């Protein structure tokens, strides 16, 4: 009987997780995400159209955090029977604030903003298109800001599943001023 009671206590103790190491001020994390840009009048999933990113996060007070992200986005712009590749390499620095959470602090909805700078490359830097036409838009340095919305789910005390959407405003771009995207990934809080 004692063995069964000790076994039951041990199973209950291991099934319950301690939340003492979550969302501590100055706690850092590393996040890796993949996603797709949302292009108006285009299918969501397209060949050679993707976004990847790596972020470093640092929790501040009251469950909010600051982040620094490096993002690479690739999409194809249709031109006749071919495509013109558009690539962006961006560095984002921002802040996320919790809007909602459950009572156990397992799921959060965050909203935030960021400032960004980067480089936009159009047609791999070539100014002549495959049919001989001259491309008037050009590759250049871009800057701007963004709005972010994310749902974060704790899978364990240090591992989170993150699903998010963002809208970036790229000033200086010849192609699009507003670039929405959706992404999903994982964060490890150290």
What are these regions (language model features)?
Residues 75, 150-190:
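Predominantly the C-terminal beta-signal and adjacent terminal strand-loop region
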Residues 22-30, 62-66, 105-111, 139-141, ...:
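Outer-envelope beta-barrel architecture signal
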Residues 39-42, 77-84, 131-137, 168-173:
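Extracellular loop and loop/strand-boundary signature of outer-membrane beta-barrel proteins
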Residues 1-26:
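Cleavable N-terminal export/targeting peptides
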Residues 52-54, 91-95, 111, 147-149, ...:
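Membrane-embedded beta-strands of outer-membrane beta-barrel proteins
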Residues 55-130, 159, 188-190:
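Gram-negative (and chloroplast) outer-membrane scaffold detector with strong preference
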Residues 19-69, 183, 187-189:
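Short glycine/proline- and aromatic-enriched beta-strand/turn motifs that initiate or cap beta-hairpins
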Residues 26-28, 46-52, 85-91, 107, ...:
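Residues that define the transmembrane beta-barrel architecture of outer-membrane proteins
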């Amino acid at each position: 009987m004692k063995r069964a009671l000790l076994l039951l206590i041990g199973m209950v103790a291991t099934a319950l997780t301690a939340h003492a190491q979550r969302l501590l001020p100055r706690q850092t994390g590393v996040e890796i995400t993949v996603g797709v840009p949302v292009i108006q009048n285009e299918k969501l999933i397209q060949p050679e159209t993707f976004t990847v990113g790596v972020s470093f996060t640092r929790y501040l007070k009251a469950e909010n955090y600051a982040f620094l992200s490096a993002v690479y986005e690739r999409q194809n712009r249709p031109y006749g029977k071919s495509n013109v590749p558009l690539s962006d390499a961006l560095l984002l620095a921002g802040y996320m604030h919790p809007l909602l959470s459950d009572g156990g602090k397992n799921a959060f909805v965050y909203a935030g903003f960021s400032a960004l700078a980067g480089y936009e490359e159009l047609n791999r830097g070539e100014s002549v298109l495959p049919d001989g036409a001259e491309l008037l838009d050009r590759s250049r340095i871009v800057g701007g800001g963004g709005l972010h919305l994310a749902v974060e789910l704790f899978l364990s005390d240090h591992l989170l599943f993150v699903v998010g959407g963002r809208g970036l405003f790229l000033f200086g771009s010849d192609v699009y001023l507003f670039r929405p995207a959706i992404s999903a990934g994982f964060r490890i809080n150290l």
